[in-house]
């Protein structure tokens, strides 16, 4: 076979017959095996030192991926970082520097998804990082933010505003500390600087013009609106921070801050005299510094020359105003072009009105910053000189502005379209826009320029008056502007008729029902400010507004109606009433006198339902009441003894009434005392008893209940009060004791007291334990050698004394509530027996043991033993030795048939030691015993 034939044989094509399978090749791969899928949800890498997320990546791995060239990897790293930090928050503190440096670096990333993930991560981190922690790294954060705001890419600029929102919300003080750079960035976001040679010699106000970028996905007006909203927020934070700083330094009074509070110092002279209360008059006084000081060190960048003054400098503020005001006017003209202006009263569409609102907000905040620095009013004159003409021309030409509502009709979903239209119209507050404009304009006017500005001032006055009188519901922001404009109008035009018209319009709004708390609070502060301003004027130039007098006269009745339904508002009413009462306002005092019975009602009055601070102010108001009739004193007594007032406030009230009485020592004529002595003593006695006449009458019907202690030797039953009521009554009685002790002619005072006890308490069969103890206490305090005790009072005292002693000796160990009464009641019982030996003798004579049951006999024996052992009573027991011996003999006779118990043995022992063994005793007792 030739070579050619061999070659053809090697490459000969195999012919297949129909119906037969193709033979398998020698190197064919078998495919008859089965496969299973292997799923790897996590990587096998593990790190025992650092926590990892679900992908087993730790913080270092995720931060290293932030430098990857692929946008998807960086986005995944940011999402993984958020997941890791949410699971392990402690990582934030340990790696805060690295986290901030890497996250802020992607603010200018070219990929939108990466920037979105960075913003979301920053929004997650910001609430978890305190300002003190982030402050060392804030220059880096601010630098990246500034780079993003001035970037040439439109998307990066838009996302930078989202970052700014987060920083303004969480760290307003830190972000406003970089105001010099950021304010310039705001200007560059909406404008550009003209660089032509002809503008070199012009001022800086004419070198900036609004910029238009056709490549942006938003319209120029929409973009400017976004920037102006952020600029308004930034200036608001700057103004708030500057106001707080100046207030902490004491450079100006607190003015328009609704959250401003002033804390008064309450001095208890009794504690102060005993060195129990330290009075610190000044905030930073004393040896220890004030730990809540607002002082903070500023960060120095490049030495002292690098300190960011921002708008705190007058020159910097004027420079920024010169740049931004012309741009804001251009935005206004663009939103409301003069050539397309419609007649006054026609509406403006939604988006232009939003731009106008932000323009006015920014100007208003700049005016607020200027007022904080303008101590000599030079800046105010400069603002009026440069911008009043432009403002009148552009702003006041179509004043007031209204919103044009555009209803979008849809056939399929009519309800949805109407709802959508309502939402759009509600997003715009054209009333607030007009009020902001009015506030800006009236701030440029003063009394000296009133004739020049009378035309547009009259427009504003008319608008303000109509807004107040139309009865529309205003929110707190609208009302704050409205009242600010009204106050400024009253200052620059102090005309009585115009002022009265404005006050009357505000009072019309005040009389509306259902006003929310912030609105009612602002109205109260406004009227209070007017009243205080009028009071500061001399009597020669003082003008008493009739509307203001009517408002003051209605405050006590409002307080009585309001009660505890709104404690905050009630507190504000009380403060205003207290201020006017201290200044002896006749209308208010007359109204307060007429409403006093409702305010000081012991059941539902404001004095018992409000918090303790308000109760204290109401108690102090009692001092200013023109008269204190008997029915009012009766209610005040009930307030003291019911426990609705604390014991300290009740003591303060008793002290105030003493100062109003004729026993205070003031040298006034008798006609000046508008509280009779009889009513005053009635008040003291009612407070001393601790129970009203009706309650004592109701107690007489109680029998066989656990709270009533009944003995077989005393006609007086004892009602056991609760421990809280007992302690409160005891503390209040101390103040009554003090008031009675300082009254001269003690014997007459004692006669009045014992006659009251004989009239109202003697003859009762059920007496509260606190009442009996307090009666004993006041008798011990007042009794001296000049006092003569009534014969009708002695048996009552003896019966009450035995009932109290029986109660004290029968208290079981498990009754912890009554055990705390033991020392107080035992002390007054021993004192009354030591001071009045006749009471002791009457009590011993009432111990007829032959009428006593077997359960009460050991109590009598224990009582006699304790009386014998008590040293102050030993002399009196010797005097009544025969009577005591007879009682012991009767007890021994009754117990002769049984085994002698231990208590009886102890009684015989004490008698033999203290009576029989006395040097004067045995000879006298030998014939009897």
Curated annotation (Swiss-Prot):
Major site of localization recorded for this protein: nucleus
Modified residues (Phosphothreonine): 29
Disulfide bonds: none
Keyword hit for Cell division: no
Compartment annotation: Nucleus, Nucleoplasm; Cytoplasm; Nucleus, Nucleolus
Family: Belongs to the IPI1/TEX10 family.
Assembly with partners or alone: Component of some MLL1/MLL complex, at least composed of the core components KMT2A/MLL1, ASH2L, HCFC1/HCF1, WDR5 and RBBP5, as well as the facultative components BACC1, CHD8, E2F6, HSP70, INO80C, KANSL1, LAS1L, MAX, MCRS1, MGA, KAT8/MOF, PELP1, PHF20, PRP31, RING2, RUVB1/TIP49A, RUVB2/TIP49B, SENP3, TAF1, TAF4, TAF6, TAF7, TAF9 and TEX10. Component of the 5FMC complex, at least composed of PELP1, LAS1L, TEX10, WDR18 and SENP3; the complex interacts with methylated CHTOP and ZNF148. Component of the PELP1 complex, composed of at least PELP1, TEX10 and WDR18.
Protein name per UniProt: Testis-expressed protein 10
Upper taxonomic lineage: Eukaryota, Metazoa, Chordata, Craniata, Vertebrata
Gene responsible for this protein: TEX10
